[in-house]
């Protein structure tokens, strides 16, 4: 009886499973699913008994009981009992199903054009701005700018000046022609200087040329100074303007101090007393201070008529007046008159000559 009862239960379960499978098969046929999906669904229903009970409850049948596991021996039921599936097997089947679906989707998407694929990817994922791309774009833009600027210049008005690509610190468009002319003038003058200065042609470079020219000019200046000093020492020339200035100073000092006057005048040993006589009237004038400097002198009180011979006193001799140390009395300017300050005159004269030569150069 027990075996008959067990056979009835197993038959009842098998009938319910057959009905569920038939219903699910109809649904799957309507949805057009694969056999693998159906098997996976039945595997999940057997794994989770709650879902199986819900499905069986909705169909109006009793849920099947879980089969008892046997140690290596099959069940003694009249029919075949279902084997319990492990969750690992179910997961493996689901993974294989997902892989097959992805393979089919890729095969369906392969006929698409590559441009459409790129557009779809661009819409789906926004590209990130790379830091190197911006720098490359900035570097590429200046390279393209000269070509574009040149094309615009040629397309527009033709300029009269010559366009020169200027570097930093140089002239550009409108000033390029003037800059070129200025440089040509400088180079031409440097060539002239090279021809004038001996040994400058061997030097290369503007800096070396300028050094050679400066050294040559300095040597010329030293030679001119030496020659001018030599000429001044060999040929002294009195500058009368300087002499007048010195006389004016000496006379002004003599007016303030009459004792300093004989130092400027002729030496007393060279002057004959008989030639230079001062009248009593002049002595009174000098004592009274009415005369300017007391230099009024008379040769003799005797007056001779015009055209007649000049009378000379008996005791006086004319030779001492006309001859001073064997030289003419009129040559007194270079020998006796300036004997007190010959050295200052020579130094002043040499300085004046040097100044005049430098001004002429």
UniProtKB/Swiss-Prot annotation:
Source taxon at top rank: Eukaryota
Annotated stretches, region: Disordered: 66-160
Ranges of residues in domain bHLH: 170-220
Tissue expression notes: Expressed in panicles, leaves, leaves sheaths, lamina joints, stems and roots.
Major site of localization recorded for this protein: nucleus
GO cellular component terms given for this protein: nucleus
SMART domains reported for this sequence: HLH
One of the GO biological process terms: regulation of DNA-templated transcription
Region (Basic motif) residue spans: 170-183
Function, in words: Together with BCL1, positive regulator of cell elongation at least partially through increased gibberellic acid (GA) biosynthesis.
PANTHER family xref list: BASIC HELIX-LOOP-HELIX PROTEIN 79, STEROL REGULATORY ELEMENT-BINDING PROTEIN
Assembly and interaction partners: Homodimer. Interacts with IBH1.
This protein's name: Basic helix-loop-helix protein 79
Species name: Oryza sativa subsp. japonica (Rice)
Lineage of the organism: Eukaryota, Viridiplantae, Streptophyta, Embryophyta, Tracheophyta
């Amino acid at each position: 009886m027990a075996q008959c009862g067990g056979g009835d239960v197993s038959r009842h379960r098998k009938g319910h499973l057959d009905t569920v499978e038939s219903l699910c098969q109809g649904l799957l046929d309507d949805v057009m699913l694969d056999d693998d999906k159906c098997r996976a669904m039945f595997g999940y229903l057997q794994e989770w008994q709650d879902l199986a009970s819900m499905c069986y409850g909705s169909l109006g049948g009793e849920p099947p009981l879980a089969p008892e596991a046997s140690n290596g021996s099959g069940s003694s039921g009249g029919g075949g009992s279902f084997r319990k599936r492990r969750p690992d097997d179910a997961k493996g089947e689901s993974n294989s199903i997902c892989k097959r679906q992805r393979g089919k989707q890729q095969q369906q998407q392969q006929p698409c054009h590559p441009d459409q694929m790129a557009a779809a990817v661009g819409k789906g994922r926004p590209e990130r701005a790379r830091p190197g791309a911006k720098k490359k774009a900035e570097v590429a833009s200046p390279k393209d700018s000269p070509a574009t600027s040149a094309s615009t210049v040629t397309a527009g008005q033709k300029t009269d000046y010559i366009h020169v690509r200027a570097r930093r610190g140089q002239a550009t468009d409108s000033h390029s022609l003037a800059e070129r002319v200025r440089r040509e003038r400088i180079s031409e003058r440097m060539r002239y200087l090279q021809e004038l200065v001996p040994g400058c042609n061997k030097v290369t470079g503007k800096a070396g040329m300028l050094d050679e020219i400066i050294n040559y000019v300095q040597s010329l200046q030293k030679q001119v100074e030496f020659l001018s000093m030599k000429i001044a020492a060999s040929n002294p020339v009195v500058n009368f303007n300087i002499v007048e200035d010195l006389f004016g100073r000496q006379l002004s000092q003599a007016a303030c101090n009459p004792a300093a006057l004989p130092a400027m005048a002729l030496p007393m040993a060279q002057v004959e007393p008989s030639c230079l006589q001062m009248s009593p009237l002049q002595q009174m004038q000098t004592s009274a201070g009415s005369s300017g400097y007391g230099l009024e002198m008379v040769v003799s009180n005797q007056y001779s008529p015009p055209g007649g011979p000049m009378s000379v006193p008996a005791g006086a001799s004319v030779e001492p007046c006309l001859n001073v140390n064997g030289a003419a009395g009129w040559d007194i300017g270079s020998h006796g008159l300036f004997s007190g300050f010959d050295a200052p005159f020579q130094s002043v004269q040499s300085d004046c000559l040097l100044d005049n030569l430098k001004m002429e150069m």
